[in-house]
Amino acid sequence: MTTIYLNLILAFTLALSGVLIYRSHLLSTLLCLEGMMLSLFILMALTISHFHMFSLSMAPLILLVFSACEAGVGLALLVKTSNAHGNDHVQSLNLLQC
């Protein structure tokens, strides 16, 4: 394995550990999730270009679209939570009832 792949796997692992460690605030959890999605996007794009699998060339873009949707929903939830409760603690999410 080359050092680029190892660095990307390390970045994914660090972002995953960030989700597990900094799970008290919603904003820090969303940032760690975005780091995970970015490392997955780069890893997928490099793997597809390295193995010349051009039939799968749309897969990184689809992952990027899902990442953008996840970020939009997460930020909307962050705004709703902070307007309703005045903080961005993950424990406040249980209080959101429609």
Swiss-Prot record:
Keywords, in A-Z order: Electron transport, Membrane, Mitochondrion, Mitochondrion inner membrane, NAD, Respiratory chain, Translocase, Transmembrane, Transmembrane helix, Transport, Ubiquinone
Catalytic activity: a ubiquinone + NADH + 5 H(+)(in) = a ubiquinol + NAD(+) + 4 H(+)(out)
Enzyme Commission code: 7.1.1.2
Intracellular or extracellular location(s): Mitochondrion inner membrane
TM ranges: 1-21, 26-46, 59-79
GO term, biological process aspect, one: ATP synthesis coupled electron transport
Gene3D superfamilies registered for this protein in UniProt: 1.10.287.3510
GO cellular component: mitochondrial inner membrane; respiratory chain complex I
Function summary: Core subunit of the mitochondrial membrane respiratory chain NADH dehydrogenase (Complex I) which catalyzes electron transfer from NADH through the respiratory chain, using ubiquinone as an electron acceptor. Part of the enzyme membrane arm which is embedded in the lipid bilayer and involved in proton translocation.
Protein family per UniProt: Belongs to the complex I subunit 4L family.
Protein's name according to its UniProt entry: NADH-ubiquinone oxidoreductase chain 4L
Organism: Rhyncholestes raphanurus
